[in-house]
């Protein structure tokens, strides 16, 4: 490889890492701002209303780029993506954060990369080494142990804890299917088409929620809702997928490990929440398990570095 080519590759990797970090930064604020929004707004309105707003932006993007329509098989797969990242994760985190703190939720969300890898492995029919499964189960056990020992109901899972676990499971499924579909449609178009596909349902639920609980909120709650709509549900995906395309999934994907740490930080700085030592300890254990799943999968020859992410 020539010196000029090496420099070009290096610049691409640097740009990818920067974009990936920007995406993680955007997503790390989702839980704190959801917590702010649901203090004044109905959680169903927050969850589905943000998708409605993002779908308007998605329609504009698809029209401007003249994106071709997905085929029938791709529409079915987009339904899985929509169920996970457009509906499932926003809904269950919104419901959970009406009673739980963002810092508490951050520990649960820390296991998301490992659960995404598990769904990706199952979907692809891969056979990773035993360490992969042990680390994945270990991360989940660490999260459940944390919830049972520190939740509102000692010795049992509270309702908010169940919502958080459902949010992680559905989001992981959506990420895994979306990652595979992005190789065909492109990352930006994948999330945009998922938003468009879900728009009739999200619009109906948003309207019903607005009628049932007329949205009256403070300026801060509306600002948080605007962030969730424009950034968490739309622009954050653009930066994240662009970073993966430029810098490679193996390199840029590691940045996601910083997301729960940043969320804990924002929870303390922006919301004044107390981050207990148990939360920090649990997050460290979960992140260690996530690292083990990624390395075990890579050593088994099934790592994400083999995936080609479209630049579209």
Feature-to-residue mapping (PLM):
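Hydrophobic transmembrane alpha-helices of multi-pass small-molecule transport proteins
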Residues: 58, 79-81, 119, 128-150, ...
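Hydrophobic/aromatic residues within transmembrane alpha-helices
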Residues: 37, 46, 50, 96, ...
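C-terminal-most transmembrane helix of multi-pass membrane proteins
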Residues: 2-9, 49-51, 148-149, 221-223, ...
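Hydrophobic alpha-helical transmembrane segments of multi-pass integral membrane proteins
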Residues: 14-19, 45-60, 64, 80, ...
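Specific transmembrane alpha-helical segments of multi-pass solute transporters/efflux pumps
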Residues: 25-31, 59-109, 145, 229-247
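Glycine-/small-residue-enriched transmembrane alpha-helix faces in small-molecule transporters
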Residues: 1-50, 54, 95, 153-180, ...
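C-terminal transmembrane-helix exit sites in multi-pass transporters
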Residues: 57-69, 112-134, 261-280
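Helix-helix packing/entry segments at the starts of transmembrane helices
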Residues: 47-49, 86, 90, 104-111, ...
């Amino acid at each position: 490889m020539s010196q000029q080519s090496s420099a070009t590759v290096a610049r691409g990797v640097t740009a990818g890492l920067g974009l990936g970090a920007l995406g993680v930064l955007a997503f790390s604020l989702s839980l704190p701002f959801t917590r702010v929004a649901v203090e004044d707004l109905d959680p169903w309105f927050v969850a589905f209303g943000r998708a409605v707003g993002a779908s308007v932006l998605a329609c504009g993007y698809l029209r401007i780029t003249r994106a071709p329509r997905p085929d029938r098989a791709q529409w079915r797969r987009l339904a899985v993506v929509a169920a996970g990242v457009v509906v499932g994760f926003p809904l269950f985190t919104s419901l959970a954060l009406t009673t739980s703190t963002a810092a508490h939720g951050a520990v649960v969300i820390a296991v998301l990369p490992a659960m995404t890898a598990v769904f990706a492995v199952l979907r692809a029919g891969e056979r990773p080494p035993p360490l992969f499964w042990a680390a994945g189960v270990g991360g989940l056990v660490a999260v459940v142990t944390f919830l049972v020992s520190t939740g509102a109901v000692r010795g049992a899972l509270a309702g908010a804890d169940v919502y958080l676990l459902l949010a992680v499971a559905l989001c992981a499924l959506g990420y895994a299917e979306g990652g595979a579909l992005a190789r065909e449609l492109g990352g930006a178009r994948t999330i945009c088409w998922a938003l468009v596909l879900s728009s009739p349902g999200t619009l109906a639920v948003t309207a019903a929620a607005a009628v049932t609980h007329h949205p009256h909120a403070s300026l801060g709650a509306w600002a948080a809702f605007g962030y969730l709509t424009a950034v968490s549900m739309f622009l954050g995906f653009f930066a994240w997928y662009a970073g993966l395309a430029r810098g490679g999934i193996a390199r840029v994907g590691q940045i996601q490990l910083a997301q729960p740490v940043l969320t804990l930080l924002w929870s303390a700085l922006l919301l004044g929440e107390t981050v207990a030592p148990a939360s920090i300890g649990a997050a460290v254990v979960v992140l260690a398990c996530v690292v083990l799943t990624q390395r075990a999968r890579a050593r088994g020859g099934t790592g994400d570095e083999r995936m080609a992410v479209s630049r579209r």
